Amino acid sequence: MNKKYIIAAMATSFALNMNAQSVKVTGTVVDSNNEPVIGAYIKVKGSNKGAVTDLDGHYTIDADKNATLVISYVGMANQEEKIGNRSQINFVLKDDANDLNEVVVIGYGQVKKGDLTSSISAIKGDKLEKLSTGNVMNALQGQVNGVQISGAGGPGASPRVIIRGVTTVNGSDPLYVVDGMPVGTNINFLNQNDIESMQVLKDASASAIYGTRASNGVILITTKKGKKGDAKFNVTATVGLQTLKKQNMADSQEYKKVYDTRYTNDGNVSPFKGSADTYTDWWKECINDVAVQQNYDLSFSGGNDKMIYSGSIGYYKQDSQYKVGQWQKLSARFSTEYNFNKMVKAGVDFTPRYEQWDDTPNLMSAIMAMDPTTPVMRAESEWTSNPYSNYERSHNNQEWNPVATMARMDSGASEYGLLATPYVSLTPIKGLTIKSAFGLNARFRRTDSFNVNFFIDNLEQNQNNNATRKMENWVDWNWTNTVNYMTTLNKKHNINLMGGYTMERFQDYWANAYSENIPNNDESLRYPSSGTKNPAATGTDSFTSLVSYLGRVMYNYAEKYYLTASIRVDGSSKFSKDNKWATFPSVSGAYRLTGEEFMKNQKVFDDIKIRAGWGKVGNQNIDNSAYLSSIGTTTYVFGGTPNRIIGSTVSGIGNTNLKWETVEDWNVGLDLALLQSRLKITADYFEKTSHDMLMKKDNLLILGYPMWNGQMWENVGKMKASGWELGINWNDQIQDFTYGVGLNLSQVKNKAVKLNGDYIWTGGFSGDYIVRNAEGESLSQFWGYKTAGIFQNETEVKSYTNEHGESLQPNAKPGDLRFVDLNNDGVIDSNDKTHIGNPFPDLMVGLNLNAAYKGFDLVANFYGTFGNDIFNKNIGRYAGTDGQNVYAGTYDKTWRTDNTGAEYPRLSVNDSNMNYKRVSDFFVEDGSYFRCKLLQIGYTLPKQWFNNKLNLRLSFSAQNLFTITNYSGADPEAASMGKSVTEAGIDYTGYPNPRTFLFGLNMSF
């Protein structure tokens, strides 16, 4: 009985105590202009209890007096308040520091995002970390408008990045600057988890401060730095599997049908060898079902009033989808900054790394073309002591056995690198900062390759094995000295001045050793010193240097009127003394309409800013000392003896008149923020024009120089790119549910304005060219014949005549393509060629979605291009024209007397009408695609489970999950790359982008 009374008393006491601690809290939420914030979410920290402000910004919530209220609203900074004994708590929300007040890195300085006058897109590193990739630029795809990123899927492959179109045939990659150190045009070495932010300088008014190397835009990368506080650790692990979509090739039965038909259509007997009952799945023999991708990272940071520090170590590995090949990299980073006193601080960013490749073969074309009736190996009774000679030769075409090719592969590379940027900064008076920074970017690479000797038959053999080793070192350094002064006069005149001087040196030296006849292809002797024949050694040492003077003035009045002007003067050793120096100026301005008094009382627009800018940037992407002629060694056979005599010859022709390529750029833009910054819109229109475009030209034979590859650098003309960009972003919060939608749209048109009256031909195809660049035309257009269907019968063939009754296609037969006499001169010849396709898209689209509810989060990123064409060389190659295997269903797609109205012309060994060997629109397909780049679902476990000491997030991701396209090839994105910007859109059957499924873990404590 006593127990019952005791329990009842305890329960009553507990209830009274709880009632005493629970209070009703009311209040009002307003913004910095004292306007009510509607829909702000007030939550009791550590619980699911919450409330939302009404139309007047009021809220009411019940909570424990020891609890803490957390208020959040999109576009504004979160606030926390402990309740204590208060029953009324009012909040004044300020703009989120990540919004207009966010600090954005610009060239040799930084500025508030709201004060930008140029076209600069900024993205935070946490968005880039979602997609697991070896090159962070793949993660940027679709995130920034005006930036076209096309990637291939091979291990270590670098994507092609084009910012606002192409204005030169001499490279398209932007300049990357990591923590103030220019590192060239490749950032494969960088650990994406180390990135704090990226800024894309898209117009010349922003990038002109980098002068000589900014013609293709500049991407500034800031790595993570330490912060004051206790040491924090973060562990990230991502492991997944990659798969390639299997190409649907014909089986042995269909292959034989197609092969035989090529001959019977010409009235010949098929020489088919082997048996259609034998089938080899070459895809299965060469391609793994899955390839493993791994990504691990450990980072730490912390600091105090005197010193901050951070560091990381990361490992990434991607296996090839082929049976051979892989790429891995190990990177580390350490960053520290020490404050000696209020005036002096110094720091260093130190990033060593190691990369290693086992070469991935380029065998997709051979795998698809290989005769499926051919076995992988010869019969054992035919084997020799050389295992590399025991593979079977293709029975019915000239393809080399791809399994044998992979077995013979023995090549790869390893590279050690170091990026270090120590600096010291002085602040002698308020607002004045003097900084001196030294940057070192060093790489040391060793490349080894061994070609075995083997004999399969007279067409597939190598009589002498050989070994090659190349040691190549690059050592670049940069010394930058800047002075910045910032001040505000009369509280309205904001001034930021910068002046500087830089020195840069780029050195490349290499040595190459070669020999032949390594005994028995011995794996332990595969290096040049083991060879007994034809030893050779070559090497060189070259360097270039750059000296620059730079300055910038930034002014704004009351954060309403803005003006920025910059100038950079560069001197480069790549040009002769008369053309060594170039000046790159820029000017930009902005007007904030919402800063006017008449805009104060409106509640729709939070920010309206109009921008305009103009500037010049340069390009010096040419050979070192291209203005100088050079002499090199060569060999020549004199008399009737086989002995080769070593001598000297002209190896390069200089051009003393060579001068800088410059790009003139102007841009107008509009930035809008509406509905309490939930909706943000950015729009830009731009034009870029290159002058004195640099290019190597094949004209030395005309000049009298007897060189097989006679080329000389020249300034050949002018190109233009123009277009528009539109970015729309919506972010909102409904209690515990937050979501965001981002849409990026952009269009760029490229045009060759002047080429000194010449054509630039690229993209070889059956002795002809696919691409023509001509004055007044769009860049890299496909140039060929128009077709008008297929001749269905002899009557149609005979009636296709000119006005004199002469046959326009005398070699044509029923089933052949009908080529159009475009100029109506009665003859079908090269004068009838015209534009048949455009490799560059009419529209680029990025769609980025995100949502979060309590511990769950979702990210979905999409990217697509529309209106671009692809020249699909594979249509002819895999239609059986030369005995290669064909796509499944080809037999039913090709014209025959019993299959008129077919999609493909008739098969023929002779192909006298050149259906499959003439550049025509028959090969051109719509290359548009829309791809789900990333779909990720994550869950963050409640922190209370770990005594509030650990954050743990688990995720599942699918990359390249699906692609919507009408393109018949393996991958429209990889195909759109071509080999260069002047061969964009030509499908060379490269490594497709794989579909990847990954599990991830992120832990911080």
Question: At which residue positions do the language-model features occur?
Answer:
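Short, small/polar-rich motifs associated with maturation and membrane association
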Residues: 1-333, 338-341, 345-351, 419-420, ...
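Surface-exposed loop/interface segments of Gram-negative outer-membrane beta-barrel transport/assembly proteins
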Residues: 114, 227-279, 320-327, 331, ...
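Outer-membrane beta-barrel architecture
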Residues: 139, 162, 220-222, 234, ...
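Extended, hydrophobic alpha-helical segments in both membrane/secreted and soluble proteins
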Residues: 177, 195, 332-334, 436, ...
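Residue-level signature of outer-membrane beta-barrel architecture
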Residues: 223-225, 302-304, 338, 350, ...
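Transmembrane beta-strand segments that form the barrel wall of outer-membrane beta-barrel proteins
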Residues: 237, 313-319, 563-572, 614
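Outer-membrane beta-barrel "beta-signal"
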Residues: 587-590, 993-1005
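Glycine-rich, aromatic-lined ligand/substrate-binding cores of catalytic
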Residues: 838-872
